[in-house]
């Protein structure tokens, strides 16, 4: 199943010594980042973000809520991030027409 693109992209810098800049634009990418690349996995916001991405991928919550969980985890881990409009996202109306 393909994850829906978020309306906004999260540009995230993770890591302490040599931070890596990542472009995350959907819940699947966020889950992969959290599970495979996230150095600090021992706080509540991280766990909420993992669960949020999982629930979004199952269709239980919106993908936009998963994005918010990711940003909260980044804040708690003191990782820099910026948010920009996702030029690749498709509105619900456009998706229904297609």
Each language-model region and where it sits:
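The feature represents the first ordered module of a protein
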Residues: 1-51
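Short, compact, well-ordered microdomains
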Residues: 54-91
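Weak global preference for isoleucine
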Residues: 14, 24, 61, 65-68, ...
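General "foldedness" signal
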Residues: 24-26, 48, 67, 84, ...
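Short, functional C-terminal segments
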Residues: 1-7, 83-98
């Amino acid at each position: 199943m393909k994850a829906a693109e978020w309306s906004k992209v999260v540009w995230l810098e993770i890591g302490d010594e040599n931070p890596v800049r990542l472009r995350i634009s959907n819940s699947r990418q966020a889950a992969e980042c959290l599970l495979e690349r996230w150095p600090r996995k021992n706080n509540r916001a991280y766990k909420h973000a993992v669960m949020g991405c999982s629930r979004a991928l199952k269709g239980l919550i919106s993908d936009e809520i998963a994005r918010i969980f990711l940003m909260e985890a980044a804040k708690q881990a003191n990782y820099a991030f910026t948010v920009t409009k996702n030029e690749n996202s498709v509105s619900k109306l456009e998706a229904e027409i297609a």
